[in-house]
A protein has these predicted regions:
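Flexible "cap/lid" loop of the alpha/beta hydrolase fold
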Residues: 4-49
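Short, well-ordered alpha-helices that flank and scaffold nucleotide-derived cofactor binding pockets
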Residues: 11-15, 111-114, 142, 146
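Hydrophobic/aromatic beta-strand patches that form the interior of the parallel beta-sheet core
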Residues: 21, 94-96, 123
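Active-site nucleophile elbow and catalytic-triad environment of alpha/beta-hydrolase enzymes
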Residues: 68-85
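Short, conserved loop/helix-junction motifs that constitute active-site signature segments
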Residues: 86-90, 115-117
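Short beta-strand/loop motif that positions the catalytic acidic residue
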Residues: 89, 95-97, 101
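Catalytic active-site module of serine/aspartate enzymes centered on a nucleophile-bearing elbow/loop
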Residues: 119-121, 126-154
Length: 154
């Protein structure tokens, strides 16, 4: 969800956007996304799971979980895609994606790389899942720092 929001902000405020980094951004709905969401729904039914989510979302944890699952699993959402917004993103983009992301295949960052309107670097992180910043923090920080330190194109 955060990656999609970041893409839309970069598109709407392109004059002010100097760079965009996405990590595990879902760009459309695919079967792997739906399978991951169904597995997440089952895991959040386990004792203590909602409490762990509350560490990040406080007393809104149940609402956040329901909004996320209900939206993405709704058949009316099946055709959603970032494709219309991506060509309007003109700042440099770094799209990081875990090779083992349980919510989306490498087709997501590839779509970002193919459609974004500015320079782009798509990087697949070997052995990482949906949260590479927690799974491989040193590697993610290094990649983001290198991207941000690179001279701006043009």
């Amino acid at each position: 969800v955060g990656g999609a929001m970041a893409v839309n902000i970069a598109e709407r405020h392109r004059a002010a956007c100097t760079a965009l980094v996405t990590i595990a951004a879902q760009a459309f709905v695919e079967p792997r996304t739906l399978d991951g969401l169904r597995a997440a729904r089952a895991s959040f039914a386990e004792p203590g799971a909602l409490e762990r989510l509350a560490r990040y979302h406080g007393d809104k944890a149940r609402w956040v979980l329901s909004a996320w699952l209900d939206t993405w699993l709704d058949p009316a959402f099946a055709g959603w895609s970032l494709a219309p917004a991506l060509p309007l993103v003109t700042c440099p983009v770094l799209a990081l994606h875990g090779e083992l992301d349980e919510y989306g295949s490498a087709a997501h960052p590839r779509l970002i790389g193919e459609l974004v309107g500015g320079p782009v670097s798509v990087q697949i992180l070997a052995g990482a899942g949906h949260v590479p910043q927690r799974e491989q923090p040193d590697d993610v920080v290094r990649r983001v720092a290198e991207f941000l330190a690179a001279p701006a194109p043009g």
